Amino acid sequence: MFKKLIGLLFLMPMTALATQFIEGKDYQTVASAQLSTNKDKTPLITEFFSYGCPWCYKIDAPLNDWATRMGKGAHLERVPVVFKPNWDLYAKAYYTAKTLAMSDKMNPILFKAIQEDKNPLATKQSMVDFFVAHGVDREIAKSAFENSPTIDMRVNSGMSLMAHYQINAVPAFVVNNKYKTDLQMAGSEERLFEILNYLVRKSA
């Protein structure tokens, strides 16, 4: 009897974890077929965000910490959304930094400038000047924001993904092309990461 009781005590946390999150309330199953696959079988977490979103800024550092803790257990990708006219420039800024292998440097700087310093960077010229101030050649920066089919294609691809997954609020996350959640569904930053952990395990 005692052994059975001990066994039940060990099972209880797992059972509680399994029933803690409710489909349709805390997360949604992606109804349509996936558009991409992760070839190395590592769970793929796609964050939909914008530098223009204050909540995206608030969770950016915790999200980076979470991704670091996950290590090889998950792969984080970011997709900038375009909900407002100037967010198109923010999407171009993200892909420009990524193309130049400057994402780790530029992401926090762009977030801080727009969210804390209240510098909207709402024109092509202001974005070009901003990138130049942080070490990018002016002609390269100008080309990225004014005439880059590659950058434009990546922005459009991101918008297609946004529509595909029916993203209407950010920050939002798609886990392994199977499940979707966002900060609004989670209700808090702490709970959001708990849900992401749960969905990573569930999708494996």
From Swiss-Prot:
Gene3D superfamilies: Glutaredoxin. It is found in: Periplasm. InterPro entries: DSBA-like_thioredoxin_dom, DsbA/DsbL, Thiol_disulfide_DsbA, Thioredoxin-like_sf, Thioredoxin_CS, Thioredoxin_domain. Residues 19-146 form the Thioredoxin domain. It comes from the Bacteria. Residues 1-18 form the signal peptide. Pfam families: DSBA (PF01323). The keyword Signal applies. GO terms for cellular component: periplasmic space. One of its GO terms (molecular function) is disulfide oxidoreductase activity. Disulfide bonds join C53-C56. Involved in disulfide-bond formation. Acts by transferring its disulfide bond to other proteins. Belongs to the thioredoxin family. DsbA subfamily. This is Thiol:disulfide interchange protein DsbA. It comes from Legionella pneumophila. The lineage of its organism: Bacteria, Pseudomonadati, Pseudomonadota, Gammaproteobacteria, Legionellales.
